[in-house]
A protein has these predicted regions:
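Class I SAM-dependent methyltransferase Rossmann-like catalytic core
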Residues: 18-83
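Short, flexible/disordered intra-domain loops and linkers
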Residues: 59-65, 144-156, 184-191
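Conserved class I S-adenosyl-L-methionine
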Residues: 83-95, 147, 173-201
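Adenosine-cofactor binding site in Rossmann-like domains, unifying the SAM/SAH pocket
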Residues: 99-128, 133-136, 154-158
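A conserved beta-strand element that flanks and buttresses the S-adenosyl-L-methionine
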Residues: 135-140, 144
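A short glycine-rich, Lys/Arg-flanked "PGG" loop and its adjoining helix->strand segment in the class I
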Residues: 151-172
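Class I S-adenosyl-L-methionine
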Residues: 191-241
């Protein structure tokens, strides 16, 4: 901490340190007030396949202002419907950032150094004990796309491996993938290629971060960061073993 303060002091002197402190204090106060508001107020809701779900709201990564607001809500509802003794795998260490530490699950993430995370590649992960349920929040689009050597087709291998080698008989997998980010994934969808047995789509419809379930034709060609920040359309994919 002292090293950070000393570094800031060298950059701009005592006044700069004071301004930096005020900026951090203001940001933290605003975050705390927003968190309190989330706890004390009732969230609006949206519909997913006839089920009314509350928008998820959280400060981390501005979840209240982007696609996380529906992704986490959909995944939370998915998990609530599972048997209590279900073996669960999360692809990508996401939920732990939003306070879901009480959900017993394994977490597979090739790059996350957290001690509870399995650091293996999703394309080759082959556990002895298979999982009754697998879920992933905005992670698959990065597989093969945001790696040192780009391999767009790796996402296909990942989905195939998860369903063939990780999912138990009668198991179910649910993933959320933003449209407009991984153009290979988008192209495959437009050609009718099916990664998932079931596909559902959401479109962001307002600057207030409201979302609506729509048909694919309504989100085909959706852009990332246009017209709103982050995802403007989402694909919810489901596979039953």
């Amino acid at each position: 901490m002292l090293n950070k303060i000393n570094k800031i002091y060298k950059q701009g002197g005592l006044i700069f340190v004071f301004k930096k402190f005020l900026s951090i204090a203001f940001r933290e106060s605003k975050n705390n007030l927003r968190a309190a508001y989330f706890k004390l107020s009732t969230s609006e809701n949206f519909n997913f396949n006839g089920r009314k779900l509350n928008y998820f709201r959280h400060n981390f990564n501005l979840a209240y202002a982007n696609e996380r607001t529906i992704e986490v809500a959909i995944v939370e509802d998915f998990l609530k419907q599972l048997p209590k003794d279900a073996r669960i795998l999360e692809l990508g260490n996401v939920l732990s950032h939003y306070g879901f530490n009480n959900i017993k699950r394994d977490v597979l993430d090739k790059y996350d150094p957290a001690p509870h995370v399995i650091n293996e590649d999703v394309v080759s992960f082959n556990p002895q004990l298979k999982y009754d349920a697998i879920f992933s929040i905005s992670t698959l689009e990065h597989v093969g796309w945001d790696e040192d050597v780009r391999d767009p087709e790796k996402i296909v291998v990942a989905v195939t491996n998860l369903t063939s080698n990780c999912l138990a008989p009668h198991g179910v997998m649910l993933v959320t993938v933003p449209l407009g980010y991984n153009t290979y994934f988008d192209e495959q969808l437009s050609k009718g290629s099916s990664y998932f047995l079931e596909k559902y789509f959401f479109k962001r419809i307002s600057s207030k971060n409201q979302w609506k379930q729509v048909d694919y034709v309504d989100v085909a060609g959706a852009k990332f960061d246009q017209p709103y920040n982050n995802a403007n359309a989402m694909c919810i994919g489901i596979v039953h073993a």
